[in-house]
Amino acid sequence: NRSALLAGLDTGEIDIAILAGEAAHDGSRREAFWSERVMVALSSSHPLAEREIVHWTDLRGERFLLPAADPGPEICDMLVGRLSVTGVQPDIRMHRCSRETILSLLGDGLGLTVICEGSAGACYPEVVYRPIHGEQGPMLIGYSGYWRDLNSNPALLRFLRFIKSRYALAFDISDSAVG
C-alpha cells in the first residue's frame, strides 16, 4: 500500500520505498530508478492473444479486472485516461483480492488485467502476456525510490550505490546525503 510505505518513511520504520509512478511526499528525496513495460494479461483463447503487441485502441470495449488495493487504483486511472471516449467509460471491475488471484481467473476468459512487466514472469494456466503500445511505442511505467535525506542507515547507502550502478543512474550519493 503506497500510503503505508510513505508513512513508514516518515516514522523511520522503513528506509526506502520503491513505488510505481510518482508520489508527492514532503521530506523525502525521490529519484527515478527504472522503467518497465506495461502488459495486458489475458486468456490464451482471447483474439488479442494472437498478436505480438496490443495497442490501447485494441482494448476499448474489454472488461478489466483489477485489485482494489495498490496498484489497482493507479491502473484504473491509467485505463480511464487511455480508454475513455466521449460518453463511454471502460468496463473496470475492482475486486478485493490479490493481483495473483485475478491472474488465476483470466484463463477462463472472465476479463483482462494490466500489469507491469516484472509481474509477467509468473505462469498461470491459459494466461498470456502482451506488451501494450501507444502512439509513441511501448507503454512504460517508471519506478522511483523515496528516502529521507537524514537517514543514517549504512545499508541504505549501499543499496542506493547498488541501484545507481545497476541501472547506470546519474543521481548524486554521498555519505553525508544519508547521514
Functional labels for PLM-detected ranges:
Residues 64-86, 153-160, 167-176:
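Secondary-structure junction motif
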Residues 14-20, 95-97, 114-116:
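Short beta-strand and adjacent tight-turn residues that come in two discontinuous sequence segments
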Residues 2-42, 55, 78, 102, ...:
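Short beta-strand-centered segments that line the small-molecule binding cleft or hinge
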Residues 1, 20-21, 88-98:
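Short beta-strand-to-loop elements that line the ligand-binding cleft
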Residues 32, 39-41, 47, 65, ...:
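Residues embedded in well-ordered beta-strands
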Residues 128-173, 178:
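A late-sequence structural motif
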Residues 21-22, 44, 116-119, 143:
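Short secondary-structure boundary segments
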